C-alpha cells in the first residue's frame, strides 16, 4: 500500500501581535497529528504563514511609524521562540504578502470570473467623515442584526457566529473616531455563493464526512431560510463581498485600480502559497504535487472561523478548478481554571513565552493539552491543579519513573544488557503490543485524550508488575540474578513501547529515550518487535522534572500594575531571561559558602533512607510527614517542607538521603528526627522547584554517603 501523501495547515495568525495560548494549542494539536502520520510512514507537508493584510494592520503600522511590510516583518521575526519552544515543527512558515500569494489569489479570482461567479454591484458603504476613508469591516461596530449583541464587528458576530454586511449592523459607529459613519456608493465585487452550482456542491461537500458531525450539523443550518435585518426572509446562502476600497493593505484586484481583495479571500490562499514556496525551495513542482489524486488536504482551525473554511474556501477552490479540502478539523476554545475567560489583569492569562521563561517544560503543556483534546470541537479548560496532578502523578510518576526503576540495575549488574522477560513479563509485553492499533486509531481521529488515557492504563499495569517483582529487593537477595534481569528487562521493553505510544506528544523526551535505549527513531511499525535479549542500553539520565506549585503561581501572578498597559510577551520573556542570567553569577543563585575542613564535614552523618510511608500534615500546606528506614531496626519520623513538589504516594518506596545525626527537633506537629536532603535554587521566585535527592539503584537503607 503506497504511503499517504498529506498537506496539513493550521489557521493563519493575524500578524498584528504575538502568538497567544489559543494559537499554541492549535499548533500543538496539529503537530501531534503530523508527527503521528510520519510515524505511520506518511509523507506530510505541514505549513503555516502569517495573515498580513487588511486595514487593521495598515492602521497599526501607521501608529507605529512603520510601513505595513516592516510592521508584519517585525511580528514574523518573533514567531520562532514560540514554535521552537513548544517543539512545533512546521516545514515552512510564510506570509500572505509573499509573491506566491499575490499570484495564486489573482489566478483564483480570474478562474472564478471565468466560471461566471463574480458579479459587480454598486453598494452603499460606510465612510468615516472624520478620517476621510471607507471603513473596513473590523472598524465598524454596532448591534448584531441576528442576536442583537452589542459592540460586534462589521463582518461577523463573535457572539452567535453570524456573517453579514457592515450595513446590516444596527446603530453602527466608527471604531477609529467614534463618529457615526455615512453611506457612500462604491462598486464592489461579489462571489456568488448563492449560485445553484455553489449551493449544490456545498450541500454535498459539507455532509459527506469531511467535517465532524457536530460541525456538519451546524453548517447545515446555514442553507436554510435566513432572516434579514429588515425582517424579511431570504432562502439559502448569501453572496460574499470580496473587495475593499483604497486605502487598503492587500492584493490589488486585477483590472480594478483602487480595489483590493478582502483579507478573507487571500488569507486561506496563503495555505497554498506557503506550500508552493516550500516545494519550490526543494526544487519540486507545485502543480504536479497538487494534481496528485492521492494527495489529502487537511486544515486545523478553531470554531470561530468555520464559516470561511466550510463555505467560502471550498467553493473558491472547487469553481476555480482546484482540489477541495479532504478534512477540516475544528477545535474549541481554551479557558483557564474552571472556565474563566483569559485576562492578564485578573491573573487568568496564560502567556506562552512567560511559561517558557519560568523554566516550565514545554512537554508538560503538550501532554496536558493532549490529555484534554478529543477530536470534537468542545472547549477545554486549563486547570492549574489538574495540570500539576496530571504531569507529576501520571506523566512522571507513572510513565517516566518506570525506566529509573530498572535501568540502574541493568547497567550496574549486567553491563546494560537485556535478558529475556519472565512468563508474566512476556504476557505483559504482549498486552502492551496488542494496544498499538487502538492507540494509533485514536491518534488518527485526533482523540489524543484517548491515546494518552490508554497509554497510562498500560503504564499502570507495568507499575503493578514492578511493584510485584520488587527489583530493589531482588538485587539484595542471593541467587536472584536471573529474576532481577528478567524483571528489569520487562520494564525497559515496556518503557520503549510506552515511549513509542507517547512520541507524537513528547518528541523531545522520546528522542532522549531513543538515545538511552540505543535505538533508531521509533515508529508504529516497531510496536510488534522487542529490543531482544543481549541488546545493550546506555546509562540512564534523568528525563523530566516535576511541576512546582511556585511555577504555576508565578505563571498566573496578577501584574503589579494591572491597569497599566501590559508589556509584550517577548519583552516579558526577555526580562525573565535577563533575571535568570543575572542569577547565574552565583551558582544555583547563591554564592559558595566559606570553606570548611574535612573534620567539619565528618561531623555530618549522611545516610541512605527508604521512605516507608509519607502523609500530609494536617494544618500545614508545606510539610509532609515521612517515615524513614535508615537500617537501624526502627523507623524515624521526619518532617520535610516539600509538599508543594510531591504527592505523598509518589515518594513511598523511594530511596533518599538524610542527615541522620541531626539533633531531634520538637515541632508543632511532632518531633522531627533528621533532615531529608533536597535541592532548590537560591532565587525561588525566578527558579521555583524542590528536588529531593534520589540515589542510584543499588544503594540500600543505612549506607553512608561519603
UniProtKB/Swiss-Prot annotation:
Function: Is required not only for elongation of protein synthesis but also for the initiation of all mRNA translation through initiator tRNA(fMet) aminoacylation.
Protein biosynthesis found in the keyword field: yes
Gene Ontology molecular functions: ATP binding; metal ion binding; methionine-tRNA ligase activity; tRNA binding
Positions contributing to ATP binding: 344
A GO cellular-component term linked to this record: cytosol
Pfam families the UniProt entry points to: Anticodon_3, tRNA-synt_1g, tRNA_bind
Reactions catalysed according to its record: tRNA(Met) + L-methionine + ATP = L-methionyl-tRNA(Met) + AMP + diphosphate
Entries under InterPro entries matching the protein: aa-tRNA-synth_I_CS, Anticodon_Met, Met-tRNA-synth_bsu_C, Met-tRNA_ligase_1, Met-tRNA_synth, Methionyl/Leucyl_tRNA_Synth, MetRS_core, MetRS_Zn
Cofactor: Zn(2+)
Enzyme class: ligase
CDD domains linked to this entry: Anticodon_Ia_Met, MetRS_core, tRNA_bind_EcMetRS_like
Gene Ontology process terms (BP): methionyl-tRNA aminoacylation
Assembly and binders: Homodimer.
EC number, as in UniProt: 6.1.1.10
Family membership noted in the UniProt record: Belongs to the class-I aminoacyl-tRNA synthetase family. MetG type 1 subfamily.
Residue ranges of the motif 'KMSKS' region: 341-345
Name the record gives this protein: Methionine--tRNA ligase
Cofactor note: Binds 1 zinc ion per subunit.
Organism: Paracidovorax citrulli (strain AAC00-1)
